[in-house]
């Protein structure tokens, strides 16, 4: 895998060099000292993956991510110091198509492998994702409908998802007539910050899903850990490490499939922007169950991977531009009365 490094700190670049040297399958294609240089390098030597810092002179990592994804798209992971303090910039970069984020490893002679572990695990997962390796579908038993259960909107998103979720959820009215559960590919270290970031932009309350709760109409909950979020036979949300071999954690497919198996009311599946195929099989299972399913269109997707996979499978009953998804949900579920 060919990797570009974008960072203005000599110490950070040295740390990244040492971390990448631990895996012989990784090759440093180039190093850029600011976002503007990275945009030029990506255009002439597009790598498989870019490790993008956020705070740099000339052009910061958010704008560089936006430019690269528009002009020379490739996988981008934000790698910067003190991610927690820069959470808003992380979500902005992910909104433009960055896949993930991780702290810059701090390396010493004694703990190089340990410190580099989180970064290398993310890179290996991205390598698998770029190779197209997903999970095989398995037969599902559908739940028996119960008229008292509220309507559920199940949303999945990955690269580009934070901005897409902000647009979609921000357009839902305060009296929206369905429960909303969203699974965004984001490390649990950023989940709480993302929930707060979305809550500030939405009329509906947004928070992390709690184990044991039942989704409630008029509220949005987000998957909040690196375990999978799923529904139980009682219609309650739980976190589970199984299945262990899934590339994506939390997995959209796992949640969508649990909706098919256990949700006793009506449901709508929505698959937004993202790299790879997660959610496509689950959305197909939802459609086969008789649920309404929506995939974001190519023109408005920061990364047209997951929605494209869904469209190819025939998983989406509708393919819509992002700005038309919320009105469609309101039309179906109710809300926005004056």
Swiss-Prot record:
One of its GO terms (biological process) is chemotaxis. The keyword S-adenosyl-L-methionine does not apply. It holds the Pfam family CheB_methylest. The active site is at 158, 185, 278. It catalyses: [protein]-L-glutamate 5-O-methyl ester + H2O = L-glutamyl-[protein] + methanol + H(+); L-glutaminyl-[protein] + H2O = L-glutamyl-[protein] + NH4(+). Residues 2-119 form the Response regulatory domain. It comes from the Bacteria. The lineage of its organism: Bacteria, Pseudomonadati, Pseudomonadota, Betaproteobacteria, Burkholderiales. SUPFAM superfamilies: CheY-like, Methylesterase CheB, C-terminal domain. Its EC number is 3.1.1.61, 3.5.1.44. Contains a C-terminal catalytic domain, and an N-terminal region which modulates catalytic activity. Residues 145-330 form the CheB-type methylesterase domain. Phosphorylated by CheA. Phosphorylation of the N-terminal regulatory domain activates the methylesterase activity. GO terms for cellular component: cytoplasm. Involved in chemotaxis. Part of a chemotaxis signal transduction system that modulates chemotaxis in response to various stimuli. Catalyzes the demethylation of specific methylglutamate residues introduced into the chemoreceptors (methyl-accepting chemotaxis proteins or MCP) by CheR. Also mediates the irreversible deamidation of specific glutamine residues to glutamic acid. Signal peptide: none annotated. PROSITE patterns: CHEB, RESPONSE_REGULATORY. Keywords: Chemotaxis, Cytoplasm, Hydrolase, Phosphoprotein, Plasmid. The gene is cheB2. HAMAP family: CheB_chemtxs. It comes from Cupriavidus metallidurans (strain ATCC 43123 / DSM 2839 / NBRC 102507 / CH34). InterPro entries: CheB-like (IPR008248), CheB_C (IPR035909), CheY-like_superfamily (IPR011006), Sig_transdc_resp-reg_Me-estase (IPR000673), Sig_transdc_resp-reg_receiver (IPR001789). This is Protein-glutamate methylesterase/protein-glutamine glutaminase 2. One of its GO terms (molecular function) is protein-glutamate methylesterase activity.
């Amino acid at each position: 895998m060919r990797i570009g490094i974008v960072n203005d700190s000599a110490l950070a670049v040295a740390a990244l060099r040492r971390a990448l040297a631990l895996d012989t399958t990784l090759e440093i294609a180039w190093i850029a000292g600011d976002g503007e240089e990275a945009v030029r390098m990506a255009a002439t030597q597009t790598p498989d993956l870019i490790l993008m810092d956020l705070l740099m002179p000339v052009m910061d990592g958010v704008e560089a991510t936006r430019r690269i994804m528009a002009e020379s798209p490739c996988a981008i992971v934000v790698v910067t110091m003190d991610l927690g303090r820069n959470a808003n910039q992380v979500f902005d970069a992910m909104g433009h198509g960055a896949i993930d984020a991780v702290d810059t490893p701090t390396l010493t002679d004694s703990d190089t492998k340990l410190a580099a572990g989180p970064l290398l695990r993310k890179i290996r997962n991205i390598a698998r994702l770029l190779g197209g390796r997903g999970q095989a579908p398995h037969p599902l038993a559908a739940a028996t409908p119960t008229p008292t259960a509220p309507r559920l909107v199940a949303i999945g998103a990955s690269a580009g998802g934070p901005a897409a979720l902000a647009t979609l959820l921000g357009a839902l009215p305060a009296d929206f007539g369905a429960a909303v559960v969203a699974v965004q590919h984001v490390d649990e270290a950023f989940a709480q910050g993302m929930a707060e970031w979305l809550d500030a932009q939405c009329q509906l309350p947004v928070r992390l899903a709690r184990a044991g709760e039942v989704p409630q109409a008029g509220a949005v909950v987000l998957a909040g850990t690196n375990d999978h979020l799923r529904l139980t036979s009682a219609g309650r949300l739980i976190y589970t490490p199984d299945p262990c071999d899934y590339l994506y954690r939390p997995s959209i497919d796992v949640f969508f499939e649990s909706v098919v198996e256990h949700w006793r009311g009506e449901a709508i599946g929505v698959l937004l922007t993202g790299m790879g195929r997660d959610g496509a099989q689950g959305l197909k299972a939802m459609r086969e169950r008789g649920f309404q399913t929506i995939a974001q269109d190519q023109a408005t997707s920061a990364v047209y991977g997951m929605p494209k996979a869904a469209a190819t499978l025939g998983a989406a009953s509708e393919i819509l531009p992002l700005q038309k998804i919320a009105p469609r949900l309101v039309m179906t579920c109710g809300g926005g009365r004056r």
